[in-house]
């Protein structure tokens, strides 16, 4: 009979291929529109053609070339959950034009796509993303068409194999695939080795390598067909409820390709390990003997990469777990923000920075002066004052409305409030610099930092008041900070609450913040509108729709990022579980090979009174060395990296990445990984030793 482990691997491969295909296509659908052959990004315009003229030209081009072209536009009020496609009509080889009547087949349930005729796009600025459905070469022709209309554009093929590999290499799902492959290969090899005695008996009956493989494949056929039917039925049932079988052929193709690749690796391993058993003569093979040296080398070739992978995944799990905990703690603050929104600026206008600043900056200043805005700009403290030896931290550039919404306490526990109108009338507009008490004595360097973030008309000698704040305060900033560099944190971390920030408080709508500053803060989600209608009114009344393409509710944005982190945590936890399983299988396998090779010596040493540790000193020494390397590798690498970063910081150069901080959670996960790995080997070795002692060397 075929070993149960081999049957399990083939069933598991089919299941995990379907899961990976689902997750991958869902992510593709959320990142862009499926089914396209090319994406054209129009990034510059001579403003010689109106949006309606561009739409008519696109419709004519699509009809002449037999393709469909669609312009993607984010929803103004719900950009992360809804998008709009403005499509050309007519017939094309892809059949995509039917979406105008039937709607877009959404694979992901988290995103709604509304389809409109391209004529409905009106006078919208033509800069943005256009999808081409049809022959890929049509995209170059469309770029030439755009050029004739005074538009500059680039072409990409995000769904092509090369660009997908580039985009997803080192992603979580990429490593999930290889973790699954490693687990499948390990379990297959172990199962074949455990069947060495059965293969020896079959060899004694005259079976060749090919005969053994054909026999195994024949025995796999029935369970494989049953598993394929079960996985197909479950997948169809799930997809029917989830998205009404949207993109079913794409899902089936990808799942089949992934399953085929995994099965190829499994079958290659199967053949290789059977061939390995032929290195032992038939009579010894009948007794269960293994090619110990070759088998041990093979196991360690799997085990060492698995150890390194497990360490990497374990540290990722710890990092994502901390991030998830932080985001969970911040949910209350975001809920209290209510309907507040930030704005998303048009990325297609990156080549017209001055024009954007001229339009957006004054509008934001007026809105700030009218009390419609909470300003929450951020800057990295060390980058503002290089060479000052200040510790890592953040400077928050906020307005007085921010001060009324978020409490900031002085050293006595009293809350700072905006300057009274009567005091302002007497002394004029002034900037308040609030410094944490822990940074007291650095006023000169911090004043220099203030000069670096405010407009050129600011005079720190006559327009700046410096105050101290209570140390240990955490200030909510309305955004995660991932758009702003910080020397102490990675961009993936949630920095919605900043510990002991330096606050620069400017009067609402004052000239201390330049138009460029307002625009930059808005692009970094640092300009918050408590009432979304204020933005909508400004867009409609001031024709700002060219520059502001969407509103982003701060609470919804936080919830979406929380969902992404939870999904990543689950996948990473799954990867960790699989890598630990591989380590356990490999650890038990090395003990089994060792015990079979040395059974007679172990039995002889036992009856001669050798101590357990002395009997197994070689394998125990190897395992202790592996456990030591496993336990110290990450801390040692962190120490080396921090030494280099500290040397850079001592020279006064701002750090390009934060210092590595190993928390108790990191060390606990590493210690647990070492304990599981080393404990499994010790337990397996003790079991094999006991069996040899009880039953004699020939019975192992």
Task: Locate predicted features.
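Selective transmembrane-helix segments that form parts of the transport pathway or gating/packing helices
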Residues: 7-13, 210-236, 255-265, 298-305, ...
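Internal/C-terminal transmembrane anchor helices
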Residues: 11, 286-322
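C-terminal membrane-exit region of the final transmembrane helix in multipass inner-membrane proteins
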Residues: 191, 196, 259-292, 594-597, ...
């Amino acid at each position: 009979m075929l070993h149960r482990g081999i049957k399990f691997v083939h069933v598991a491969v089919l299941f995990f291929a379907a899961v990976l295909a689902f997750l991958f296509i869902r992510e593709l659908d959320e990142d862009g529109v499926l089914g396209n052959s090319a994406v054209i990004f129009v990034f510059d315009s001579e403003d010689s053609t109106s949006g309606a003229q561009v739409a008519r030209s696109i419709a004519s081009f699509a009809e002449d070339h037999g393709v469909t072209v669609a312009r993607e536009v984010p929803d103004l009020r719900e950009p992360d959950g809804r998008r709009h496609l403005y499509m050309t009509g007519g017939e094309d080889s892809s059949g995509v034009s039917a979406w105008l009547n039937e709607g877009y087949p959404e694979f992901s349930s988290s995103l709604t796509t509304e389809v409109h005729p391209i004529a409905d796009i009106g006078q919208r600025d033509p800069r943005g993303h256009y999808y081409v459905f049809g022959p890929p070469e049509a995209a170059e022709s469309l770029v030439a068409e755009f050029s004739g209309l005074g538009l500059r554009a680039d072409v990409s093929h995000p769904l092509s194999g090369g660009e997908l590999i580039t985009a997803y290499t080192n992603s979580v799902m990429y490593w999930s695939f290889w973790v699954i492959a490693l687990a499948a290969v390990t379990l297959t090899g172990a199962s074949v080795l455990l069947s060495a005695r059965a293969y020896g008996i079959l060899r004694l009956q005259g079976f060749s390598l090919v005969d053994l493989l054909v026999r195994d494949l024949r025995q796999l056929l029935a369970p494989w067909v049953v598993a394929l039917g079960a996985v197909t039925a479950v997948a169809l049932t799930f997809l029917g409820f989830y998205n009404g079988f949207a993109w079913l052929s794409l899902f089936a193709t990808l799942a089949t390709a992934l399953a085929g690749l995994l099965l190829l690796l499994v079958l290659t391993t199967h053949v290789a390990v059977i061939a390995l058993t032929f290195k032992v003569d038939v009579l010894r093979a009948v007794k269960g003997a293994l090619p110990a040296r070759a088998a041990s080398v093979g196991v360690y070739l799997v085990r060492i990469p698995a150890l390194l992978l497990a360490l990497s995944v374990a540290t990722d799990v710890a990092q994502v777990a901390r991030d998830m905990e932080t985001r969970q703690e911040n949910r209350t603050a975001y809920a209290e923000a209510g309907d507040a929104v930030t704005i998303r600026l048009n990325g297609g206008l990156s080549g017209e920075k001055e024009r954007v600043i001229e339009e957006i900056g004054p509008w934001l200043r007026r809105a700030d002066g009218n009390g419609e805005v909470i300003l929450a700009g951020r800057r990295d403290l060390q980058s503002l004052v290089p060479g000052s030896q200040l510790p890592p931290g953040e400077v928050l550039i906020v307005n007085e409305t921010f001060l009324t919404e978020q409490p900031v306490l002085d050293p006595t526990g009293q809350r700072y409030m905006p300057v009274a109108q009567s005091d302002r009338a007497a002394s004029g507009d002034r900037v308040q610099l609030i410094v944490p008490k822990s940074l007291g004595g650095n006023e000169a360097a911090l004043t220099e930092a203030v000069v670096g973030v405010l407009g050129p008309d600011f005079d720190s000698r006559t327009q700046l008041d410096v105050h101290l704040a209570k140390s240990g305060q955490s200030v909510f900033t309305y955004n995660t900070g991932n758009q702003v560099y910080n020397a102490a944190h990675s961009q993936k971390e949630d920095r919605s609450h900043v510990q002991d920030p330096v606050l620069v408080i400017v009067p609402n709508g004052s000239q201390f913040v330049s138009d460029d500053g307002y625009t930059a803060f808005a692009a970094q989600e640092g300009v918050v509108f408590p009432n979304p209608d204020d933005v909508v009114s400004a867009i409609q009344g001031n024709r700002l729709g060219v520059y502001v393409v969407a509103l982003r509710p701060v609470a919804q944005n936080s919830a979406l990022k929380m969902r992404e982190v939870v999904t990543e945590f689950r996948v990473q936890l799954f990867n960790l579980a699989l890598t630990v399983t591989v380590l356990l299988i490999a650890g038990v396998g090395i003990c089994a090979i060792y015990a079979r090779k040395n059974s007679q010596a172990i039995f002889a040493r036992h009856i001669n009174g050798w101590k357990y540790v002395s009997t197994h000193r070689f394998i125990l020494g190897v395992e202790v060395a592996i456990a030591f390397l496993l336990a110290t590798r990450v801390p040692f690498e962190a120490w080396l990296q921090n030494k280099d970063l500290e040397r850079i910081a001592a020279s006064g150069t701002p750090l390009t990445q934060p210092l590595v901080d190993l928390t108790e959670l990191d060390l606990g996960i590493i210690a647990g990984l070492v304990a599981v790995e080393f404990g499994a080997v010790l337990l397996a070795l003790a079991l094999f030793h006991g069996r040899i002692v009880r039953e004699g060397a020939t019975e192992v």
